[in-house]
Design a protein with these regions (language model features):
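Bacterial Sec-dependent N-terminal signal peptides
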Residues: 1-25
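Mature catalytic domains of secreted/periplasmic carbohydrate-active enzymes
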Residues: 23-487, 497-509, 723
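Aromatic, loop-rich ligand-recognition surfaces of beta-strand-rich domains
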Residues: 380, 384, 388-391, 399, ...
């Protein structure tokens, strides 16, 4: 049968290849179609020929990039605004984008993405098409332009610039004259719309058949893509706090404009780059970037019902696809609890240990790491954040700037630190030998994804120790990059073995490094009786990369010290020897290894729950009784049988306490029933109630982390009633994994 190929022009793609012959030569492409007659073997062969575009490859090479969330939420202490905030709430006096960029550069980042418009519709640049933004604030007498400042600082510090422009727009929804969902007709419109006195230096014109809101969005895209220097990523969030009027987005028009005005930009959420499935920095054991899709728009991953599912590119899913397409993941999380800055007292900041760990798991797991660093109300990064960024960058540089295989004997194509050159493996093995013995605990592998795609499905690495090969690490796929972590070994020879593949394997790089072990991160837990335990944090990944017993004996001879009064712990503090009793206090703990302190872990502990009981009976679904909401086990949860709102849970704490706040832990079994908004009421006798505080927890579905609520003033109570007035997610039946009162 003769080879039959067809190239279809699709927005966002650099080629759609269709192969009809079972034995035809497959041309590498960004997207390859599957036909009904394709065998499973041919489908896997096609998958092995799916490659990134040049823009995608450049984005992969960025590896570590920054998010900056800044806007009215910074001043209202909220995660999501409502769109009706007075712009003057954004009460910025000073702005230091040079400090931002220097800090990000010190961390080893290569690009920064700014939320120029979040869901509230407030814009951070001098737009011609709205007055809901920086132009209506007192910042620089209404003449300030945060995007302009950041663009200049990026150029100064050699950082690429990306833009987050939320398709959702609560201002355009809530404003009586708003354009979102106003049921306007689709008519031919010229982009950009001319505004008297504000001409564009870029004279490019577009004609699209769109409605009012799509025109508004396109006009704003035109502004930010033509007046602020080169743009390398455009980020379209999929979150929608609210919709109206059946508003649809004309993504094809948006993409055409972006491809024309920002030809080097990748687009998040529309074919180029995708979400990793969580906002907590959790990475998959296996992260394929060659994915199965149902449609040409590349919006429906075959078989995917939940973005948090594991291994979304596995073989059995490929067999059911209509298209195979390269779409890389970004692992996005925040350096702080929440996307926006709230305060420097209660809002916790990730340690450098934590950030460096996520860096190795994401960049070393075939993904890009995007870390949010939110500026404070003084227009700067807080000191805590800057210190963490500097320490993270120091560790990255100390660990990965010197390849210990430099000058080693082996294929020069895998030792030249060039991800374009490669070596095709013979017998699926590769051996390199150093001139002298080297001590290592990191191996970095890369496939030649730009020419040969992703082919390794599982692999192992051996070291020559004591006259024989010893396996020191193993994992699943490799892709753009895989970082293997293991206990330190000293060797001269390293062997890569590919155990399963999708075709002839092309390795572009193998490198070896040494990471100086630090004291571990800690976790602080309180049980139902009030006893507090402190232990090493369990890492959220499961690579076959470390012999736990060996590490415990060799590398982890550390002690834990703690305080119970909120003061900083050190070697002169209480030494942890086992669980201790503590109610209503702030525990701070640190591990010290060979005189070096690790990151300080802080946890506010509440009232012991062994005397708590329901003051009003509440039904729960099977295996999810109301008592699970206060059993000191965040893995269990109460799920109400009632789907009506409001819903409440009333508790008898067993005695009269002075309370300063509450903590709510959402369940993580599914994305629904989360307590987004409500009130906390207190009572001394269970009959007469008064409100202690209202609460609103944003972004729970994407980030179901523990949320703290501090009352404006301390209250005395024996009885507490928590009422949910709004529930987030795909189920209205209220769920609570844990309630704490402190």
């Amino acid at each position: 049968m003769k080879l039959k190929t067809c190239i279809t022009s699709l927005a966002l793609l650099e080629g759609l290849v269709c192969i009809s012959a079972q034995n035809a030569k497959i041309i590498p492409a960004n997207t390859i179609a599957i036909t009904p007659t394709d065998s499973k073997e041919l489908i896997i062969e096609k998958a092995a020929h799916v490659i990134p575009t040049k823009n995608q490859l450049d984005a992969l090479r960025n590896e570590f990039i920054a998010f900056i969330h800044f806007g009215p939420n910074t001043f209202t202490h909220m995660e999501w605004g409502n769109g009706m905030e007075d712009p003057k709430i954004f009460d910025l006096k000073e702005l230091d984008t040079d400090q931002w960029c220097k800090s990000l550069k010190d961390a080893g980042m290569k690009m920064v993405i700014l939320t120029v418009k979040h869901h509230d519709g407030f814009v951070l640049w001098q737009s011609r098409y709205t007055d809901h933004g920086i132009m209506s604030t007192n910042f620089r007498n209404g003449k300030g332009d945060i995007l302009r400042d950041l663009s200049k600082s990026c150029q100064k510090y050699g950082l690429k610039l990306g833009l987050y422009l939320s398709p959702a727009d609560l201002y355009q929804i809530e404003n009586p004259k708003g354009l979102y969902g106003n049921l306007s007709q689709y008519t031919k419109r010229t982009i950009p719309r001319e505004v008297p006195g504000r001409p564009f230096s870029n004279k490019t014109k577009f004609e699209f058949e769109v409605d009012d809101y799509n025109e508004y969005f396109l006009n704003q895209l035109f502004e930010i893509l033509t007046e602020y220097g080169p743009i390398h990523e455009v980020w379209f969030d999929g979150a929608h706090p609210k919709t109206k009027g059946g508003q649809k987005y004309n993504y094809e028009a948006w993409k055409k404009l972006i491809h024309t005005l920002a030809p080097k930009a990748v687009i998040f959420g529309q074919g180029d780059v995708r979400w990793c499935g969580n906002e907590a920095g959790v990475t998959r054991k296996t992260e394929w970037n060659v994915l199965p899709f149902n449609n040409k728009d590349l919006t429906e991953i075959t078989g995917l019902t939940d973005w948090e599912e594991d291994n979304i590119g596995r073989r059995d899913r490929l067999y059911d696809a209509h298209f195979l397409h390269y779409q890389q993941a970004e692992v996005d999380t925040s350096i702080r609890e929440g996307w926006f800055y709230r305060d420097d007292v209660y809002q916790k900041v990730r340690s450098a240990d934590d950030v460096f760990d996520i860096y190795e798991r994401s960049v070393g797991g075939n993904s890009t790491f995007i870390l949010n660093v939110p500026p404070n109300r003084e227009g700067k990064f807080s000191d805590q954040d800057v210190k963490v960024l500097a320490e993270t960058g120091k560790r990255i540089k100390e660990t990965y700037s010197k390849d210990l295989l430099q000058g080693a004997k082996g294929s020069k194509q895998v030792l030249d630190h060039n991800d374009i050159t490669y070596s095709l493996l013979s017998n699926n093995q590769l051996i390199v030998e150093s001139k002298l013995p080297i001590t290592i605990n990191r191996i970095v592998l890369q496939e030649a994804v730009s020419t040969h795609g992703e082919r390794v499905e599982s692999h192992a690495v051996d070291a020559w120790i004591g006259g024989k090969w010893k396996e020191i690490a193993a994992a699943t796929n490799i892709g753009y990059k895989r970082i293997l972590r293991f206990s330190e070994v000293t060797t001269r020879k390293i062997r890569l073995r590919v155990l399963q593949d999708r075709g002839s394997v092309a390795i572009s790089s193998i490198a070896a490094y040494y990471y100086k072990m630090r004291p571990p991160q800690l976790t602080i837990l309180q049980d139902k009786t009030g006893k507090v335990s402190i232990d090493e944090k369990k890492q959220p990944f499961d690579w076959k990369n470390q012999d736990k017993k060996d590490i415990k004996d060799k590398d982890k001879d550390f002690n834990i010290y703690y305080t119970t009064d909120g003061s900083e712990p050190g070697i002169n503090s209480l030494k942890y020897n086992g669980p201790f009793e503590k109610e209503q206090g702030t525990i701070k703990a640190v591990a010290i290894l060979k005189g070096e302190p690790g990151a300080v872990q802080t946890e506010v502990v509440g009232i012991a729950k062994n005397k708590w009981k329901l003051s009003e009976s509440k039904d729960g679904t099977k295996n999810h009784s109301a008592e699970a909401a206060f059993d000191a086990n965040p893995k269990t949860f109460w799920q109400s049988t009632n789907q009506n709102i409001p819903q409440s849970l009333s508790l008898d704490l067993g005695a009269l306490y002075t309370l300063t706040g509450m903590a709510y832990t959402p369940q993580t079994a599914f994305g629904g029933g989360m307590m987004a908004k409500g009130i906390v009421e207190i009572s001394a006798d269970g009959k007469k109630w008064e409100t202690a505080s209202a609460f609103e927890f944003g972004n729970l579905v994407n980030d179901p982390s523990k949320r703290d609520l501090y009352f404006k003033q301390a209250v005395k109570a024996r009885y507490v009633r928590v009422t949910a007035q709004e529930v987030a997610g795909n189920s209205q039946a209220l769920t609570i994994a844990e309630l704490d009162f402190f």
